[in-house]
């Protein structure tokens, strides 16, 4: 009779109901119930994940008897079974039972525990599930069949390793409720006892606390920590977080008793139903009648079954993947000798882990144990690296990597890569990746014309694989010519400073300024040629330790020691080849490591040698036949003779040069049997016979026709086994490139240019009839050094049909597919090898008028790439005829390709003059397109806006062509932008690292920071231009005078030099001491007051006559103090960097005999491109005027100081007097710290003059140990409020400028701000210095009697680096540092120059159209400039582009590179000390003599009688008869010789100075001197007075 059906299911209760955990007084201390529950759960989980063997027929009866006994016995006979009405919830609340469906070969787990004597301690085996069950209901037939098929549990002896039970354990731990339910109802009957369910292996008892360690009666269970080798599997995750469907299924009320019985043996309860795990059968008396749960909704059984099946499949897949991954990691960690433990089965391990792991903290423990420590990671990585080396270098066996170091291999080209040290080999690996948009080198060179033979100076740029030359650095899109280095044969230095670049069509001759510059260009071009012709290839060097004779340090390079590895030549035992390695992270450590490795190498008998007569047996299966088979091309049935190689999956095409040293299992070298044309079945599995005659001399004796001239290199020794990776299509790779020789003096070790290709012209032969390999001398072959160049892997889809159709046939039909994969690198000699890469043009134009159909298009593409020197990857999309306007319209054709917009003139006149013949603009540089009216009737115009360049105007004959061009260009611009190819390469990255790591996916070592300077692409082994080899740490002194802006760049430079390991010091005015030392830089004080100097410059102008007159009165003593203090400040220096304004540096460096550099913030070197910064006219006057300003200023400046300087040289420095010509200032290396974007380097500057970029000092006002700078209070709110009101914010500040009327200047600025409608941040400092410092500064309300409006926020000082990026425009005085800061922020800049170089920067800003210049400050002009700066979109966008380019520069890095590069040159120009007889002529007066003694210079004559030989007169200067400048004075009216006559040779009156400008006339005419140049005298003539 069925009990009444509950109307609604009760709420869910915890998994353990009170009846399941209650105890009675007669049950004082029962065994733990959870132990048995865990045992059952683990059994259930293990049965579905751990396949086991089924029991034998003999074991089945015994197991049935045990099951019967276990069902009849009772652990506690005195206890009574509970009433049938009492119900109990299932103990599981996690994984549904059907998800834990076991396999047929499952094994149960038993928990053994020490219990009191009153309890039974024997185990109860699991009852066979397929046995008929005793129940109050008749089981459903289908359900019984399902249970019978699903629950066939068997015992097993070996279940596997711990990994096989780990997932089961996780499921059990997550499903088992370890915590005791403290909130259970105590009112329940505590005396009720649940009899053990049938089918379970033990009785469930309650316990208060789960033991943390297993308590077992068996002593063979050791305690261990459980490690989970893989993440929590899917079953455990679903057990922790079951889905809604799973919960509905678990807690659903069963419809029939048969389903409940057959599905899970579940129990019903008024509290709700939870199915028991499989293997648990409820007691017959506890089964609820079938009608109780019919009111509850139950899902469709088919849906449940499908869901369970799907989830089971997902779980199996995930779990299998985790197990395999764990197995692989475990095997790699332990090596091949790893043996799984056999002492314990997985059931015992699962039981121990279940008892030991804490329930509440199990997830944390699992997560913690899953994390591998650093030692394990390192071990795993070493194992992977050893495997990788064995594969890449073709080693015979896996060798432990003892050391891995970055280094350079020094040969005819410098190769950067990695060295790996093993117990048997020294391996070197270098890779040349594909790099685009790489600026390698640029600079001025003279090019010899092909017709006139005249040399013309161009700006030459080596970018990617193209050498181009331009008329100007400011016009980078119109090259005058170019050379594609891909087709160059050679680049060699010739006589003097000339070098030639040779192609198949013609030779090009270039001339550099110096031999060192010539060598750099030659190395750069050679390196790019090598890289281009071997792009994507790898270079490998394998040196067996057996071949090493000695290892020693060699001073090959000046700035670093190289490690020389000497190896015996395998060809000639009397010769030794040397390999030089340099630039290790630690040279001493690398040297000691290599030495130790060589000392501890095995003795020769222990090392396997390559025998000349070697027989290889292939009857052992482990022998990899694919690595020992070489097939001569042209033979038939190559697939058959390759044996297993044809079936071996392709693994790595670039496997290299494995030494032919194959061992048998006992370690002895294997012998190789010949396999002739007729062989039996037993020999069918043997290797084909290999015979390689590697002796060069023998081949010469045997064949007179086989002449070997040393190149291409040939293989020495038997071909390595790895060449069988593709043994059927050997072809010498040097055929495709005429001059791709890697090693200039190639050692006689083996040099294989491509594995898998047999050089047809080498002496290596393959025969099939000889019984054995023959030796050239009969003695054992020594291990030889292997050098390999491997081409990149080419895939089939990368090779076009045209390439295959034009490629010579070098392989048989069986290897055609492999040949297609490599055709791209082998088709160099094909004329149409790149034709298939063309996109069909939309027009029918052919540049040369070809009419050959499809070949016309291919010919067009080929010639397009040739004309513009573009790579084969560049695809021509379309081309249009049109006109390019360069003063006059130039007819030609515009080409649009994948990444470039090009133009080529078609006019004969322009072709002859090579003027505007070519235009090449990267599409990434295009800023916009704008249709416009044409200049001519019937044409359509188009304006092309280029980033950082002037606009280009072009015309088309029809609007349709213009529309098509615009559409295509816009499409390409968008495509380039989306593909990320629009990044601009840093201009300072002039050199590239072409060598990469061994394993691209896993770095060989952590990416430690390399030196700041980029690694060189054109390093010379004899030149310091190889910047990777830095000099030893030096003591560097920076000498400068002037304002704060003159000192700040040197602080930035010194901090960069300190980062390089040098000791730096700044010598400047004493008022900057605290500031300099606050940045951690040593300080030395020099004389002079910058405030007085600045005031004099503002009042009188820079270096005018009035400035000189006032200087005579005030600064004669100042100059003496400056010279003497500079000499003292520079003591102990190894290198001196000076601003030319300090005037003393070149003399101090000569006395100290140290390298000397100059650095300045404005142009100081003669050029026709820009005027002198102190003589900038209001309007441009052309190149002659610009050059004259430098000449004039140099002469006047030297004349002004020469007298005092020469006396100081004699009295303090111990040097003879000098002249302007003998100083040779134009030869001094110069560092200009402004941007090449703002001031492009002129063509007439030499190669030791560098425009490095700005030396920015971020947070200049911060000091070491002080808190960071913070903006003034209210400034941020002011800026945000203005932007919120849509007003522009500008900065106005003129620095510490001394002005005559500060009140008027303040009023002008305020009115301009109000009239322009902007908000201004005003930094009023123009009355804070010099004689004006006593005046009031003003406050935030106003200054100088002018009240500030709300639109002005007044500040005292501000960090420009913080402020400028937050505002819209800046107006300042035009100092070099402030101008650089505003341009760097990318905002329009307004400059009001006051003195010095400020007018120059104002002119540059206006020329670049990134701002305005105000010559005369008025409120109207300033307001107009502010309006234009904040509203002119063209000016704003141009300023933004310039800012982006400046931010990409790194001026400090480039300056340090230039210092390293020119250090050798700077040392070479140090003058030697003269002998006592070589005294220079001297002058007799000084500019700074008092004005009241006009003839004092004559009375101060100090004549010395000197005897000179003719041989000594020309030692220092070719103009030896030029007398010293000490006897001339602008003020005194000159001096005359003691003989009363001027020297006809040296008198300046007879020198044409070409001073015809208004400025020059004004300077010299206002001097009011009877003789502008004064009198010159020759002391040699006056000695005999």
Curated annotation (Swiss-Prot):
<feature type="binding site">
    <location>
        <position position="1046"/>
    </location>
    <ligand>
        <name>UDP-alpha-D-glucose</name>
    </ligand>
</feature>
<feature type="compositionally biased region" description="Polar residues">
    <location>
        <begin position="760"/>
        <end position="785"/>
    </location>
</feature>
<feature type="binding site">
    <location>
        <position position="1377"/>
    </location>
    <ligand>
        <name>UDP-alpha-D-glucose</name>
    </ligand>
</feature>
<keyword id="KW-0444">Lipid biosynthesis</keyword>
<feature type="binding site">
    <location>
        <position position="1398"/>
    </location>
    <ligand>
        <name>UDP-alpha-D-glucose</name>
    </ligand>
</feature>
<dbReference type="Pfam" id="PF02893">
    <property type="entry name" value="GRAM"/>
</dbReference>
<dbReference type="InterPro" id="IPR004276">
    <property type="entry name" value="GlycoTrans_28_N"/>
</dbReference>
<feature type="binding site">
    <location>
        <position position="1043"/>
    </location>
    <ligand>
        <name>UDP-alpha-D-glucose</name>
    </ligand>
</feature>
<keyword id="KW-1207">Sterol metabolism</keyword>
<dbReference type="InterPro" id="IPR002213">
    <property type="entry name" value="UDP_glucos_trans"/>
</dbReference>
<dbReference type="InterPro" id="IPR048065">
    <property type="entry name" value="ATG26_PH_GRAM2"/>
</dbReference>
<feature type="binding site">
    <location>
        <position position="1044"/>
    </location>
    <ligand>
        <name>UDP-alpha-D-glucose</name>
    </ligand>
</feature>
<dbReference type="InterPro" id="IPR011993">
    <property type="entry name" value="PH-like_dom_sf"/>
</dbReference>
<keyword id="KW-0756">Sterol biosynthesis</keyword>
<feature type="binding site">
    <location>
        <position position="1373"/>
    </location>
    <ligand>
        <name>UDP-alpha-D-glucose</name>
    </ligand>
</feature>
<keyword id="KW-0752">Steroid biosynthesis</keyword>
<dbReference type="Pfam" id="PF00169">
    <property type="entry name" value="PH"/>
</dbReference>
<dbReference type="InterPro" id="IPR001849">
    <property type="entry name" value="PH_domain"/>
</dbReference>
<dbReference type="InterPro" id="IPR048066">
    <property type="entry name" value="ATG26_PH_GRAM1"/>
</dbReference>
<feature type="compositionally biased region" description="Low complexity">
    <location>
        <begin position="1529"/>
        <end position="1545"/>
    </location>
</feature>
<feature type="compositionally biased region" description="Polar residues">
    <location>
        <begin position="806"/>
        <end position="817"/>
    </location>
</feature>
<protein>
    <recommendedName>
        <fullName>Sterol 3-beta-glucosyltransferase</fullName>
        <ecNumber>2.4.1.-</ecNumber>
        <ecNumber>2.4.1.173</ecNumber>
    </recommendedName>
</protein>
<dbReference type="InterPro" id="IPR004182">
    <property type="entry name" value="GRAM"/>
</dbReference>
<dbReference type="InterPro" id="IPR010610">
    <property type="entry name" value="EryCIII-like_C"/>
</dbReference>
<feature type="compositionally biased region" description="Polar residues">
    <location>
        <begin position="105"/>
        <end position="123"/>
    </location>
</feature>
<dbReference type="GO" id="GO:0016906">
    <property type="term" value="F:sterol 3-beta-glucosyltransferase activity"/>
</dbReference>
<keyword id="KW-0472">Membrane</keyword>
<feature type="compositionally biased region" description="Acidic residues">
    <location>
        <begin position="178"/>
        <end position="194"/>
    </location>
</feature>
<feature type="region of interest" description="Disordered">
    <location>
        <begin position="625"/>
        <end position="645"/>
    </location>
</feature>
<feature type="compositionally biased region" description="Polar residues">
    <location>
        <begin position="65"/>
        <end position="92"/>
    </location>
</feature>
<feature type="binding site">
    <location>
        <position position="1360"/>
    </location>
    <ligand>
        <name>UDP-alpha-D-glucose</name>
    </ligand>
</feature>
<dbReference type="GO" id="GO:0005975">
    <property type="term" value="P:carbohydrate metabolic process"/>
</dbReference>
<feature type="compositionally biased region" description="Polar residues">
    <location>
        <begin position="132"/>
        <end position="148"/>
    </location>
</feature>
<feature type="domain" description="GRAM 1">
    <location>
        <begin position="387"/>
        <end position="555"/>
    </location>
</feature>
<keyword id="KW-0963">Cytoplasm</keyword>
<feature type="compositionally biased region" description="Low complexity">
    <location>
        <begin position="255"/>
        <end position="273"/>
    </location>
</feature>
<dbReference type="GO" id="GO:0005737">
    <property type="term" value="C:cytoplasm"/>
</dbReference>
<feature type="binding site">
    <location>
        <position position="1358"/>
    </location>
    <ligand>
        <name>UDP-alpha-D-glucose</name>
    </ligand>
</feature>
<keyword id="KW-0328">Glycosyltransferase</keyword>
<feature type="compositionally biased region" description="Basic and acidic residues">
    <location>
        <begin position="670"/>
        <end position="689"/>
    </location>
</feature>
<feature type="region of interest" description="Disordered">
    <location>
        <begin position="666"/>
        <end position="852"/>
    </location>
</feature>
<feature type="binding site">
    <location>
        <position position="1378"/>
    </location>
    <ligand>
        <name>UDP-alpha-D-glucose</name>
    </ligand>
</feature>
